[in-house]
């Protein structure tokens, strides 16, 4: 019997099954069964329910071992978010705690379970609360693309799952002969997808460890990093430099943190400076090119974000994709594709 219920009714959306994981032939894992108005975790006896797998494929792309399983208020459990990370589970909480029943049920899966409190210092790493002690660093698949994941890292474990569909589109929009710039690149996931599409990439981040991690992700996917560009420093200063040099790109990705301070102490706030960032990037865009503009700033509404971006690129076409289907809760991610008409 499941221990997590909504309004007293058990739900069969989830079951513990086998999933994609590099270096482990058949790890047990939590997979989506089907989207429903109520939420629960099912017992392991459903592991051989093949119908569950077929319905799961309609939501999660093939060869994907990382996705959101329970999405807070969207699944009737405000403040609790459960992510599958290959054969590990990450439970994030905001303004609440994991109940004893849920923790017990997570322990019963036999998988390593990690807990991260989102209201605490975002640089703190998750804490393992259950399951066997497996390596904290491992490789996981997303849409057939390999990424290094690190459960001991603070801020994030190496990839933002809510950008999965955007990464796929970046790959589709990239082609041999194209140049793609990924600013605020973190571990270079967008860059890897663009390179797999055939583009030459420039990966830009303020932190050298992130650029080193990005190089590892290229290698994991059979891409020689020496054929790509990596730039350390402030994105705004690099964009100004590219514009002065006349260096342009067919695609540019802008996904800055909500707040940051560069190595000179200059502050960047999305709600105040995003439009200026887009205007800088426009000067580096090839005619007919595209930009992906995103932000998870909760202080900024979708319409305000759209107006801010539109003012920076008058006459350009702006479109917005839906959130991935496993993110059914708060529509927090501001996102716009910009196409040079």
Residue ranges and their predicted role:
Residues 75-76, 83, 99-161, 168:
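Non-catalytic substrate-recognition/targeting regions of SAM-dependent transferases
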Residues 235-238, 242-311:
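S-adenosylmethionine
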Residues 177-183:
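Conserved class I S-adenosyl-L-methionine
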Residues 1-86:
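Non-catalytic accessory regions of SAM-dependent methyltransferases
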Residues 212-247:
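S-adenosyl-L-methionine
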Residues 14, 290-341:
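C-terminal catalytic and target-recognition region of SAM-dependent MTase-like enzymes
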Residues 187-199:
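Conserved SAM-binding loop of SAM-dependent methyltransferases across substrates and taxa
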Residues 200-205:
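Conserved SAM-binding motif I beta-strand of class I
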